[in-house]
Amino acid sequence: LHWSIFVEAVYMNSELPPVLSQFQHNTYLIRQKIFKLFGAAFHIYDPAGNVAFYSKQKAFKLKEDIRIYTNEDMSMELLTIRTESILDFGATYHVNDPQQGGVHIGSLRRKGLKSIIRDEWVFLNAAGQEIGLIQEDSAALALLRRFYLGWLLPQQYDGTLGNVPVCNFKRNFNPFVSKVTLD
Protein backbone atom coordinates (compact mmCIF):
# COMPACT_ATOMS: atom_id res chain seq x y z
CA LEU A 1 0.00 0.00 0.00
CA HIS A 2 1.30 3.43 -0.83
CA TRP A 3 -0.24 6.64 0.53
CA SER A 4 1.14 8.67 -2.40
CA ILE A 5 -1.39 6.93 -4.70
CA PHE A 6 -4.15 8.79 -2.86
CA VAL A 7 -2.29 12.11 -3.04
CA GLU A 8 -1.72 11.66 -6.79
CA ALA A 9 -5.37 10.73 -7.35
CA VAL A 10 -6.57 13.81 -5.49
CA TYR A 11 -4.31 16.09 -7.52
CA MET A 12 -5.51 14.35 -10.75
CA ASN A 13 -3.27 15.39 -13.64
CA SER A 14 -1.91 18.36 -11.72
CA GLU A 15 1.74 18.71 -10.90
CA LEU A 16 2.38 17.69 -7.31
CA PRO A 17 3.76 20.56 -5.24
CA PRO A 18 7.35 19.84 -4.05
CA VAL A 19 6.31 20.23 -0.42
CA LEU A 20 4.17 17.10 -0.79
CA SER A 21 7.28 14.91 -0.93
CA GLN A 22 6.54 14.26 2.75
CA PHE A 23 3.57 12.17 1.57
CA GLN A 24 5.84 9.68 -0.21
CA HIS A 25 6.42 7.31 2.73
CA ASN A 26 4.73 3.91 2.98
CA THR A 27 3.88 4.18 6.65
CA TYR A 28 3.26 6.83 9.32
CA LEU A 29 2.58 6.82 13.04
CA ILE A 30 0.00 9.35 14.22
CA ARG A 31 0.27 10.17 17.91
CA GLN A 32 -2.11 12.46 19.76
CA LYS A 33 -0.44 15.04 21.93
CA ILE A 34 -1.48 14.42 25.53
CA PHE A 35 -2.17 17.10 28.11
CA LYS A 36 -3.44 19.54 25.47
CA LEU A 37 -5.90 21.71 27.36
CA PHE A 38 -7.93 23.06 24.42
CA GLY A 39 -8.37 21.49 21.00
CA ALA A 40 -6.37 18.53 19.76
CA ALA A 41 -2.87 18.19 18.37
CA PHE A 42 -1.21 15.30 16.58
CA HIS A 43 2.36 14.48 15.62
CA ILE A 44 2.68 12.39 12.45
CA TYR A 45 5.98 10.52 12.24
CA ASP A 46 7.69 9.03 9.18
CA PRO A 47 9.21 5.50 9.28
CA ALA A 48 12.52 6.89 10.63
CA GLY A 49 10.73 8.46 13.61
CA ASN A 50 11.03 12.05 12.36
CA VAL A 51 8.08 14.43 12.53
CA ALA A 52 6.69 14.52 8.99
CA PHE A 53 3.59 16.55 9.86
CA TYR A 54 1.94 18.28 12.77
CA SER A 55 -1.81 18.70 12.96
CA LYS A 56 -3.79 21.07 15.10
CA GLN A 57 -7.53 21.13 15.57
CA LYS A 58 -8.91 24.39 16.88
CA ALA A 59 -10.92 24.29 20.09
CA PHE A 60 -14.44 25.61 20.60
CA LYS A 61 -15.27 25.72 16.89
CA LEU A 62 -18.82 24.84 15.89
CA LYS A 63 -17.48 23.72 12.52
CA GLU A 64 -14.43 21.45 12.33
CA ASP A 65 -11.22 23.26 11.37
CA ILE A 66 -8.12 21.04 11.14
CA ARG A 67 -4.73 22.27 9.95
CA ILE A 68 -1.77 20.16 8.85
CA TYR A 69 1.71 21.68 9.01
CA THR A 70 5.22 20.54 8.14
CA ASN A 71 6.24 20.63 11.82
CA GLU A 72 5.27 21.83 15.29
CA ASP A 73 6.43 25.42 14.73
CA MET A 74 3.52 25.69 12.24
CA SER A 75 5.55 27.85 9.85
CA MET A 76 4.25 26.08 6.72
CA GLU A 77 0.64 25.00 6.43
CA LEU A 78 0.20 22.05 4.04
CA LEU A 79 -3.52 21.31 4.18
CA THR A 80 -6.68 22.68 5.72
CA ILE A 81 -9.64 20.43 6.42
CA ARG A 82 -12.96 22.10 7.18
CA THR A 83 -16.62 21.27 7.27
CA GLU A 84 -19.53 23.58 6.57
CA SER A 85 -21.97 21.75 8.83
CA ILE A 86 -22.21 21.98 12.58
CA LEU A 87 -23.42 18.41 13.12
CA ASP A 88 -20.97 15.63 12.28
CA PHE A 89 -23.55 12.98 11.32
CA GLY A 90 -23.02 13.03 7.55
CA ALA A 91 -20.58 15.89 7.24
CA THR A 92 -18.38 16.60 4.24
CA TYR A 93 -14.83 17.67 5.10
CA HIS A 94 -13.30 19.89 2.41
CA VAL A 95 -9.54 19.59 1.91
CA ASN A 96 -7.74 22.69 0.60
CA ASP A 97 -4.13 23.37 -0.35
CA PRO A 98 -2.90 26.67 1.15
CA GLN A 99 0.36 26.33 -0.80
CA GLN A 100 -1.64 26.84 -4.00
CA GLY A 101 -3.80 29.72 -2.81
CA GLY A 102 -6.31 27.62 -0.88
CA VAL A 103 -7.43 25.62 -3.93
CA HIS A 104 -9.95 22.87 -3.13
CA ILE A 105 -8.29 19.50 -3.83
CA GLY A 106 -10.91 17.06 -2.60
CA SER A 107 -13.26 16.06 0.19
CA LEU A 108 -14.09 13.30 2.63
CA ARG A 109 -17.79 12.63 3.25
CA ARG A 110 -19.05 10.50 6.10
CA LYS A 111 -21.90 8.16 5.19
CA GLY A 112 -24.11 9.06 8.13
CA LEU A 113 -26.63 6.22 8.42
CA LYS A 114 -24.18 3.50 7.37
CA SER A 115 -21.66 4.82 9.89
CA ILE A 116 -23.97 4.08 12.81
CA ILE A 117 -23.13 0.39 12.43
CA ARG A 118 -19.84 0.51 10.51
CA ASP A 119 -17.90 3.71 9.81
CA GLU A 120 -17.70 4.56 6.13
CA TRP A 121 -16.21 7.61 4.42
CA VAL A 122 -16.10 8.52 0.73
CA PHE A 123 -13.12 10.19 -0.99
CA LEU A 124 -14.27 12.88 -3.45
CA ASN A 125 -12.07 14.66 -5.98
CA ALA A 126 -12.20 18.44 -6.47
CA ALA A 127 -15.13 18.06 -8.89
CA GLY A 128 -17.14 16.19 -6.24
CA GLN A 129 -16.86 12.80 -7.95
CA GLU A 130 -16.48 9.73 -5.76
CA ILE A 131 -12.99 8.27 -6.22
CA GLY A 132 -12.54 6.06 -3.18
CA LEU A 133 -13.73 4.73 0.13
CA ILE A 134 -12.50 4.34 3.72
CA GLN A 135 -14.37 1.63 5.62
CA GLU A 136 -14.14 0.13 9.09
CA ASP A 137 -12.80 -3.42 8.96
CA SER A 138 -15.85 -5.41 10.12
CA ALA A 139 -19.49 -4.68 10.93
CA ALA A 140 -19.46 -7.25 13.77
CA LEU A 141 -16.32 -5.77 15.35
CA ALA A 142 -17.68 -2.25 14.83
CA LEU A 143 -20.83 -3.11 16.79
CA LEU A 144 -18.77 -4.64 19.60
CA ARG A 145 -16.59 -1.51 19.68
CA ARG A 146 -19.57 0.80 19.91
CA PHE A 147 -21.65 -1.05 22.46
CA TYR A 148 -19.37 -3.24 24.53
CA LEU A 149 -15.62 -3.53 24.07
CA GLY A 150 -14.54 -0.30 22.39
CA TRP A 151 -11.43 0.12 24.47
CA LEU A 152 -10.32 -3.53 23.95
CA LEU A 153 -10.86 -3.76 20.18
CA PRO A 154 -8.81 -1.08 18.40
CA GLN A 155 -10.41 0.35 15.28
CA GLN A 156 -9.08 -0.48 11.84
CA TYR A 157 -10.02 1.13 8.53
CA ASP A 158 -9.14 0.21 4.95
CA GLY A 159 -8.98 2.81 2.18
CA THR A 160 -9.39 2.13 -1.53
CA LEU A 161 -9.36 4.14 -4.75
CA GLY A 162 -11.64 2.27 -7.11
CA ASN A 163 -10.80 -1.30 -6.15
CA VAL A 164 -7.14 -0.58 -5.39
CA PRO A 165 -6.13 -0.67 -1.69
CA VAL A 166 -4.20 2.53 -0.86
CA CYS A 167 -4.17 2.86 2.92
CA ASN A 168 -4.92 1.17 6.22
CA PHE A 169 -5.49 2.95 9.53
CA LYS A 170 -5.03 0.84 12.65
CA ARG A 171 -5.46 2.24 16.14
CA ASN A 172 -2.89 0.72 18.48
CA PHE A 173 -4.12 -0.58 21.81
CA ASN A 174 -2.92 1.91 24.41
CA PRO A 175 -5.27 3.20 27.11
CA PHE A 176 -3.11 6.27 27.80
CA VAL A 177 -1.88 7.63 24.44
CA SER A 178 -3.84 7.57 21.19
CA LYS A 179 -1.67 6.10 18.43
CA VAL A 180 -2.72 5.20 14.89
CA THR A 181 -0.56 3.44 12.31
CA LEU A 182 -1.22 4.55 8.74
CA ASP A 183 0.05 2.21 6.03
Per-segment meaning from a language model:
Residues Y11-D183:
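Intrinsically disordered, low-complexity proline/glycine-rich segments
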